[in-house]
């Protein structure tokens, strides 16, 4: 079950590979995510020293959050990945010109996980072509529906 999707990632990138990663979250963040108060639209993932971090993900604190904790809505959040996955991602991003984007946030056995994608950027004409294909697909469905 998806909590939040990053539709902009599918519009701006060709997704080559998908990997599920854990997140290091604080208690108030988990409560806010369960209440679907999260936005992935402008977020991205980068490598720093020894781990990957999610930046730009906006998690809005609930009004009932603790008074002694000052919630930071856009703080960098560490991703939890296996060493083999880390090596694969580093190799692809450094050599082949790929980037890593968050695709969605979902529950897996009660834990909050993030699906990240190894992606290559789309050019403007690729975006136009994707939009034409989506429009044609919608039009086909409309025609099929009306001919029945």
Swiss-Prot record:
Its main location: cytoplasm. It is found in: Cytoplasm. Keywords: Cytoplasm, RNA-binding. GO terms for biological process: trans-translation. Residues 127-142 have a biased composition (Basic and acidic residues). One of its GO terms (molecular function) is RNA binding. Residues 119-148 are annotated as: Disordered. GO terms for cellular component: cytosol. Required for rescue of stalled ribosomes mediated by trans-translation. Binds to transfer-messenger RNA (tmRNA), required for stable association of tmRNA with ribosomes. tmRNA and SmpB together mimic tRNA shape, replacing the anticodon stem-loop with SmpB. tmRNA is encoded by the ssrA gene; the 2 termini fold to resemble tRNA(Ala) and it encodes a 'tag peptide', a short internal open reading frame. During trans-translation Ala-aminoacylated tmRNA acts like a tRNA, entering the A-site of stalled ribosomes, displacing the stalled mRNA. Belongs to the SmpB family. This is SsrA-binding protein. It comes from Neisseria meningitidis serogroup B (strain ATCC BAA-335 / MC58). The gene is smpB.
């Amino acid at each position: 079950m998806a909590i939040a999707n990053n539709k902009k990632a599918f519009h701006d990138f060709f997704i080559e590979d998908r990997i599920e990663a854990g997140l290091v979250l604080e208690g108030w963040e988990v409560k806010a995510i369960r209440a679907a108060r999260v936005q992935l639209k402008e977020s991205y993932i980068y490598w720093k020293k020894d781990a990957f971090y999610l930046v730009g993900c906006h998690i809005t604190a609930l009004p009932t959050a603790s008074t002694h904790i000052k919630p930071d809505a856009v703080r960098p959040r560490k991703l939890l990945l296996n060493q083999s996955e880390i090596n694969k991602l580093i190799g692809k991003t450094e050599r082949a010109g790929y980037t890593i984007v968050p695709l969605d946030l979902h529950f897996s056995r009660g834990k909050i996980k993030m699906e990240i994608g190894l992606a290559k950027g789309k050019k403007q004409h690729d975006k136009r072509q994707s939009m034409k294909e989506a429009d044609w697909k919608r039009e086909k469905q409309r025609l099929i529906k009306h001919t029945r």
